Amino acid sequence: MITKVSDFLFRTFREDPATTESRGYGFLLRAGYIRQTGSGIFSWMPLGLKVRHKIENIIRYEMRQVNAIEVLFPALFSADLFKQSGRWSEYGDDIFRLKDRRQGDYLLAPTHEEAFTQMMKEICTSYRDLPRTVYQIQDKYRDELRPRAGLLRSREFSMKDAYSFDLDEKGLRQSYEAQKRAYKKIFDRLEIDYVIVKANAGAMGGSVSEEFLHPTEMGDDTFVVTADGSAFNAEVYVTLPGPAIDYSNAPEAEDCETPGVISIPDLVNHMNSSGRFIGRVIESSDCLKCLLFRIEYAEVQNGNPGNLVVKKILERGFEYIGFLVPGDRNVDLKRAQVALSPLTIEPADNRVFECNPSFVRGSIGPGLSGVFYCADPRVSSGSSWIIGANRPGVHRIGAIAGRDFSFDCTLDVSSIKTGDKSEWGPVTVKRGIEIGHLFQLGLKYSNALGLKVLDKDGYNKAVFMGSYGIGVSRLFALIAEKNCDERGLKWPAVLAPFDLHVVLLSSARAELIDSLTDCGLDVLVDDRRVSPGVKFTDAQLIGVPKIIVIGDKTRGEDVEVWDRANDQRTVLPLKEMIQGVIQRSDTGGCTERCTGVCPTR
């Protein structure tokens, strides 16, 4: 098929928009693959849709290989099912809520567990109806507080979400492993790097969860890799607790004047210059800082949060939470939010300090009224610290945990660093972006929504569920980010919007294009009346892997072939070049080319 640029909905831009946060995102906007229409909201243009559909069709192909059945649900839902499952409250401000003219509650679905469960409840009545795996590719909606990086974190995004339904846990594990194998094939075919990490189920619920993360410094997910090759999302990583220490002979804690000290570096410098520690250098890790957060109470399902720490906070009505962490650490907010779900927390701002005179900035420590204290696992009984004394310009030296100060609970929410010790040895900390997530949901939604079938003995039995998601629009953005240089995009052949990009420089040789009509390839022909420089610049920006130059420098059937991947240029007869492209396409693992169900078309 031949598409002429003069007949195409197409425009490129020479400069990145001011809001561009990454090179690949900038090229997607400049080349006209997508257009931003609002904060975290994008329109898909013809070039972008062609690539997106190829990603979707690869996913569809691999889903068919594991007998998954495609359906399509609406994005708009009544809140009834979400209230029944408990997620109407669990999601808090992260979902778009709205009311109809009768004041009924609705939402734009962030995921579709409830809808799939209800559908299967109405269709499946017997064990003979199981197992089943059903999926859709649909837009989702989340009210991101700070949308960023284009399609990587947007308010509207495309996902493939699949759900398995089995009679028992063994069947659930088999369905889970089948999806996991399919995901590996999908990401391998898309040529995207990934690491499989153990993860937290979060608001999705369930017991077993794994993420597919694409390693990149752009990522907002932290994961750790252990010496034996195991990988964990930071949210589920377990810090080794410090050893209990006998403090029966430890000296008494002392108050120390620390005028002007408001940070850990200030405190370390002051201590090392005070002359109190002869022969010893004080490090940040010798100090215990208290990071103060304001607690925001969310509606808790049935008054029971299912989280003992949160239950304590609710029962005693605390307004603030103080995290006691070593001075060389910070609070990992994602770990903290997971540990305290369904509560949300916000760092204490100036207003908090203005309303609470006892909160002394720079010298906050244990013992404040109205604060629920959570200590890092390293704060073991008998460990000695330099802490804030809750008085201006005063800290305490040699404060012993369990003797001089106490806390309400131990909570593992500190930041993790490369070299930290784990039960598997030292860890390496990396960053990544989630591209896929697998959950063994178990009976959470089946029990909540009454999904049961009759077993062989005629008894009603709750159905075991699994949930499996892939971020389609996020994959699109990441693949663009990975496959670009300073001049533009460089799509893998399996995903490129066209097989060939013809730069027509000589109208006298335009008849060569006729030989491309029936070759079975998708061809973009730049027939615009613009300068060769503009055409070449746009060809590099768009990123089709093979650029064919038809001009006066070649004769007869010869054309110049420009390989966008390595920038090599060769002169070949047009038919030979076409045959080479077709052969490479036909040996790429696809056995259904030109049958109408090709996973890349």
Swiss-Prot record:
Keywords: Aminoacyl-tRNA synthetase, ATP-binding, Cytoplasm, Ligase, Nucleotide-binding, Protein biosynthesis. It catalyses: tRNA(Pro) + L-proline + ATP = L-prolyl-tRNA(Pro) + AMP + diphosphate. One of its GO terms (cellular component) is cytosol. GO terms for molecular function: aminoacyl-tRNA deacylase activity; ATP binding; proline-tRNA ligase activity. It comes from the Bacteria. The keyword ATP-binding applies. Its EC number is 6.1.1.15. The keyword Flavoprotein does not apply. It is found in: Cytoplasm. GO terms for biological process: prolyl-tRNA aminoacylation. PROSITE patterns: AA_TRNA_LIGASE_II. Consists of three domains: the N-terminal catalytic domain, the editing domain and the C-terminal anticodon-binding domain. Homodimer. Belongs to the class-II aminoacyl-tRNA synthetase family. ProS type 1 subfamily. Catalyzes the attachment of proline to tRNA(Pro) in a two-step reaction: proline is first activated by ATP to form Pro-AMP and then transferred to the acceptor end of tRNA(Pro). As ProRS can inadvertently accommodate and process non-cognate amino acids such as alanine and cysteine, to avoid such errors it has two additional distinct editing activities against alanine. One activity is designated as 'pretransfer' editing and involves the tRNA(Pro)-independent hydrolysis of activated Ala-AMP. This is Proline--tRNA ligase. The lineage of its organism: Bacteria, Bacillati, Actinomycetota, Actinomycetes, Micrococcales.
